[in-house]
UniProtKB/Swiss-Prot annotation:
Enzyme class (EC, first level): transferase
Keywords annotated in UniProt: Carbohydrate metabolism, Fucose metabolism, Glycoprotein, Glycosyltransferase, Membrane, Signal-anchor, Transferase, Transmembrane, Transmembrane helix
Annotated protein name in UniProt: O-fucosyltransferase 4
Gene that specifies this protein: OFUT4
Species of provenance: Arabidopsis thaliana
The UniProt record lists the keyword Metal-binding: no
Membrane topology (UniProt): Single-pass type II membrane protein
Principal location: membrane
Binding site for substrate: 332-334
Top-level taxonomy: Eukaryota, Viridiplantae, Streptophyta, Embryophyta, Tracheophyta
């Protein structure tokens, strides 16, 4: 019969983790005699078995859970992504970036802070009396466009163009058409003015310019007629749309007209070019530039009604500013609703302004600003100098440049956006400000009132004869004026061109002081003075820079004609 000790040992030897896979033999009788030795060996064996058992349990758990280990990386990455996604939503509302200096319209706050100092500035000398005294530096230019006296050769045919855009874009087309006709020895038909839904002006050439004077002035250089001869129109069923039309690329070189247009002109005897805005390169031979000079500076004269009304307003402005020897400042202000809307800039009109601009953009450009992916950045526009100056900013700038409260200013502008509110600060700084509507009666302006180009022509005339011209936004109007003024005033444009990027930063400076601002404005004025004399480079517009193609040095005893 097996003893109890043997049974216990037999059970113990069958547990997982024992040293043997088979049962151990019975204990030696010798070992059984010594209880102490037997107990010691048994304790060591039990301790080892417990450790082995625990190790096996841990290993078996890990082996059974190896499927989880395979998915551990995926689970880890998913948790990290979820955490980052949640963190981004939680963090975005509490990130407050300070707008870049110059990106926010704060000019009203600047004016409120400087207003007292502006009023207290007791400067007696008006800048208008001294502004251009150091301009010429011994270099002066004079008009130098010779007109032909010989007989023109037989014409190669008739060219008919359509001039599109506003007053001065049409003027560009007219001058370029004269140049092309002269270059190709063609006869120019009086250009047709294309009606545009934005300008809404049905005026014809003769309504704006003196047509007879135009034809007579060019008679020995370029033939100009008012219509295509009947014998040619008969071929096209008296319909100009049946005439072969060239769709010329913008800024086409003269070689294109020689190689492509002239052969067709010789074949058809009449051609049409539509549209014709900016269809001739500014980098043209000297002979072609002469035609441009002749057309722009000599042949194009406003029609008698416009010229008379314009000269009347010039005389009124000179009379009002008699204390300054008849000198006045003209400002071309572009703060009409369509300009404000197109600029996509934000001013101080709040929700009402926002709604007005949305409506104006939709009326004028029908979805252009709401296309998918179109991003409007008002702050970036302001930093880049693309926001039109407000009446308030123009006033601050001119006062900083040294023009005092008594200066007479002529404002050339369309209907100013929110005029009652936006014009108040400018009128406060310059109470002698005038517009054509203030200088002329409703009856005097009635023939021009519903025609934007005719009204612009009156503004152009008054600005042309001012002592100082201030441009606040780019465009054809100031560009033509600057060139025309250079032609009249010895090569100097007598024009202030603000650095709008610099102004944006200054008007956004909460610590700006009046003396510091004045220094900055006087520096800007001086820079405009130095840029008054500029010679045309190859790619420049001859309508902005008439020297040296249309002018020659006055201090030379003999000057070669262009």
């Amino acid at each position: 019969m097996i003893s109890q000790v043997e049974r216990d040992l037999s059970i113990q030897n069958r547990l997982p983790g024992s040293d043997h896979t088979t049962p151990s033999p019975p204990t030696s009788p010798h070992l059984c005699r010594s209880r102490s030795k037997s107990s010691s060996v048994s304790g060591q064996q039990q301790s080892r078995n417990v450790a082995h058992r625990l190790s096996w349990i841990i290993l078996s758990v890990l082996l059974r859970r190896q499927g989880i280990l395979l998915f551990a990386p995926i689970i880890y990455i998913s948790c990290m992504l979820f955490h980052l996604h949640a963190a981004s939503f939680d963090a975005s509302p509490i990130i407050h970036r300070r707008p870049a200096p110059g990106s926010v319209y704060r000019s009203p706050q600047v004016y409120a802070r400087l207003r007292g100092e502006i009023e207290a500035d007791n400067t007696t000398a008006d800048a208008i009396s001294t502004i251009w005294k150091r301009s010429y530096k011994g270099v002066e230019w004079k008009p130098c466009v010779n007109m032909s006296t010989g007989v023109l050769p037989v014409s190669n045919g008739f060219i008919f163009i359509e001039a599109n855009g506003g007053l001065n874009q049409q003027r560009t087309s007219i001058c370029n058409a004269v140049a092309v006709a002269g270059y190709l020895n063609a006869t120019l038909v009086i250009p047709n003015f294309h009606y545009h839904s934005i300008w809404k002006d049905p005026s014809k050439f003769g309504d704006i310019y003196d047509e007879e004077y135009f034809i007579d002035t060019l008679a020995n250089d370029v033939r100009v007629v008012d219509t295509v001869p009947e014998y040619l129109m008969e071929r096209f069923d008296y319909n100009l749309t049946n005439v072969y039309n060239f769709r010329v690329k913008a800024w086409a070189p003269t070689s294109y007209y020689r190689d492509s247009v002239l052969p067709k002109l010789l074949e058809e005897k009449v051609i049409r070019i539509s549209p014709f805005a900016n269809r001739l390169s500014f980098d043209a031979p000297r002979a072609v530039q002469r035609f441009r000079c002749l057309a722009n500076n000599v042949a194009l004269r406003f029609s008698k009604p416009i010229l008379t009304q314009g000269e009347t307003l010039v005389n009124k402005m000179k009379g009002l500013s008699a204390n300054n020897a008849g000198k006045y400042v003209s400002v071309h202000l572009r703060f009409e609703e369509d300009m404000v809307a197109f600029s996509c800039c934000v001013f101080d009109g709040g929700d009402q302004e926002k709604q007005d601009m949305i409506a104006a953009r939709e009326r004028g450009w029908k979805g252009k600003f709401t296309k998918p992916g179109r991003v409007i950045r008002p702050g970036a526009n302001r930093l880049n100098g693309k926001c039109p100056l407000t009446p308030l900013e123009v006033g601050l700038m001119l006062r900083g440049m040294g023009f005092n409260k008594s200066t007479y200013i002529f404002l050339a502008a369309g209907p100013i956006y929110s005029a009652n509110r936006t014009m108040a600060p400018l009128l406060e700084m310059f109470p002698n400000l005038q517009t054509k509507e203030m200088l002329a009666s409703e009856e005097d302006l009635a023939p021009f009132k519903n025609f934007s180009s005719r009204m612009a022509a009156i503004d152009y005339t008054v600005c042309l004869h001012s002592e100082v011209f201030v441009t606040t936004q780019g465009g054809n109007f100031p560009h033509f004026l600057m060139g025309h003024r250079r032609y009249l005033f010895g090569g100097h444009s007598k024009t202030i061109q603000p650095d709008k990027r610099k102004l944006a930063v200054l008007f956004d400076n909460p610590k700006l002081g009046w003396k510091s601002f004045k220094r900055q404005m006087l520096s800007m004025r001086s820079h405009s003075d130095s840029k008054g004399f500029e010679l045309k480079r190859s790619s420049d517009s001859i309508y902005i820079f008439p020297c040296p193609d249309c002018m020659c040095r006055k201090n030379k005893t003999t000057a070669s004609a262009t």
